[in-house]
Amino acid sequence: MDAIGICNQVLSGLQIKATCVNAEQHRHLAFYDLRLDSGCRVRRIELFSREIALGVRSKTSPIITSIPEKGIVRIRVANETSDILKFDDLYQADEKPVGIFPCLLGETDTGAKLWVDLAMHPHTLIAGGTGSGKSTALHIIIANAIRNDDVLLYLVDPKNGVEFGLYNKMANYIATSYEETIYMLKELCAEMDRRYFVLHELGMSSIEQNPNVFPKIAIIVDEVADLMIFDSSKQPNKGCFERLLVTLAQKSRAAGIYIVLATQRPSVDVLKGTIKANFAARIACRVSSAIDSKVILDRSGAESLLGRGDAILDSSTHECVRFQVAYISPEDNCRESMC
């Protein structure tokens, strides 16, 4: 019996008046599209979602979404035996789209490669708890930066180099403390001002008019929550980190400087309005609650992700696209940088 037949058999056994009209198996996810009979409510599908998942031989909690334009309810389940989606298997340099800072993030749930140009958005926020794939997403952005010859890396690792320590020889600067982060951001603000002066002299308003005029700069900050906590207690420089970050976020894009912030705790105390307003691209891995999901995505849903790199990208060019973050280790990134 095929997947559609198995699903319909399960629905019948549960006395659910719905028909599976489509079933697709992909590398990491399978989904089943149900068309409800008259009188059948979505709530009933949600009530028996666990039993449906078990019936189609999935051990993971399913995710139920309504797709009104198609008149269906979609049940997504994870493939327990799926292979690791390796970045090196996915990345092909000759497939890289034209752009200022194109990044290959992974694969959508329909099997398509997910490319995003970080330069098309002011900046990027990443959130996710332990085991969600947040750190992997950071390493993927670093992997893309390495493969762009004209991208300079500035990394912030408040955990004393635990996350980014292996990049010591390839990054332009790694800050591992609050004080080092403040120094780095001040230097980058000065570089931003210098670039604006050069652009003015050239009669340009943005690096987009000639992407080759400066090397791009990627600022990648892990666990911004730790820095915000320090920032609220430091005297006499209280708030210095936030002020420098907002200054860069508001002005740096036109100068070819792009910021990626990551946090395990996407609370309103960490991602304040002045910060969120300038970080239009959001990558949500699994978070602990619907409240956290609303902070990062302005909607619930990320709390139901499956972990291990199951993520949602929301930006001006990709509206809530679910995808699997590709995997690459820091060691692989370091080997690539030496090639």
Where would I find each of the regions flagged by the language model?
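P-loop NTPase catalytic phosphate-binding loop
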Residues: 6-22, 27-35, 40-44, 51-55, ...
